[in-house]
From Swiss-Prot:
Transmembrane segments: none
Protein name, entry field: Putative acetyltransferase SACOL0827
Superkingdom classification of source: Bacteria
Keywords: Acyltransferase, Repeat, Transferase
SUPFAM superfamilies assigned to the protein according to its UniProt record, in alphabetical order: Trimeric LpxA-like enzymes
Membership in a protein family: Belongs to the transferase hexapeptide repeat family.
Pfam families according to UniProt: Hexapep_2
Enzyme Commission no: 2.3.1.-
Presence of keyword Transferase: yes
GO molecular-function term, one example from the UniProt record: acyltransferase activity
Amino acid sequence: MRKFLSKTHHHTNPLWRVYRLVKFSKVFKNVIIIEFSKFIPSMVLKRHIYKQLLNINIGNQSSIAYKVMLDIFYPELITIGSNSVIGYNVTILTHEALVDEFRYGPVTIGSNTLIGANATILPGITIGDNVKVAAGTVVSKDIPDNGFAYGNPMYIKMIRR
């Protein structure tokens, strides 16, 4: 079950008034850091930048591949466990703007988890330990430990251990 907070707007879409919800200076700083860091080849340096400058909780030996796009409004709501791999061009969102509502919530990715290339993780999602998410999957609901998720709409199978 996705977990998020919601703020509604009755007369305009929330992106039109987003800087009433999130400071412009914070978003500007986050965009510069995230866009620059997407192209850093060193996993150690990238991990350090994300932890120190964006307050993302990243476990030991976790790798964030080339061109991963992190949420620009609330990157501090992202947690990644130890020894996990976030694949090429993955998008991790902690917010979503609908026509009349702005939602935001934490994204938690467990340990020993693989997120395949071009996957998109929506806000408020918890992905367990030892999970495999196939390339291109839109993660729209929680995935339990030892799960294998694939497709859009997403399907989940359990991995036998």
